[in-house]
Amino acid sequence: MSLPNCPKCQSEYVYEDGILLVCPECAYEWNPAEVEKEEGLVVIDANGKQLADGDTVTLIKDLKVKGAPKDLKQGTRVKNIRLVEGDHNIDCKIDGFGAMKLKSEFVKKL
C-alpha cells in the first residue's frame, strides 16, 4: 500500500502509527479518513450565513472602486457569485461595472 504525501510539507517519508499517519520531517500527524471528509472552501457573509456558488447577494455599504468614476452603492444586487480562494473571495459581474472581486464581509445573502 502506498501512503499519501504529507499534506503540510509534501514529504514522501510518511509512516503509519496506529490509525494515524505521521510525517518525520515536520512532525505532522493526521488521520487519513478525516482528510477525505474535509469540506472545500467555506465563505461566510456579514450576517454569518454560508455562501455558495450561484447565490445572489447585496452590498451592505458603499464601496469605492479604484479607477471607476463612481462607487458601488449600498443595496446593489450581485447575482450568480463564484467563490474563490484569497482575501477577495467572491468573483462576480456587476451591471455597469463588469467583472469584480469582493470581500464577503461587505455582502449579505438574499
Swiss-Prot record:
One Pfam entry for this protein is Zn_Ribbon_YjdM
Q: Give the gene that encodes this protein.
A: yjdM
Similarity remark? Belongs to the YjdM family.
Which NCBIfam families does the record match to this protein? phnA (TIGR00686)
Q: Which InterPro entries match?
A: YjdM, YjdM_C, YjdM_N
Please state what the protein is called: Protein YjdM
> Which branch of life, at top level?
Bacteria
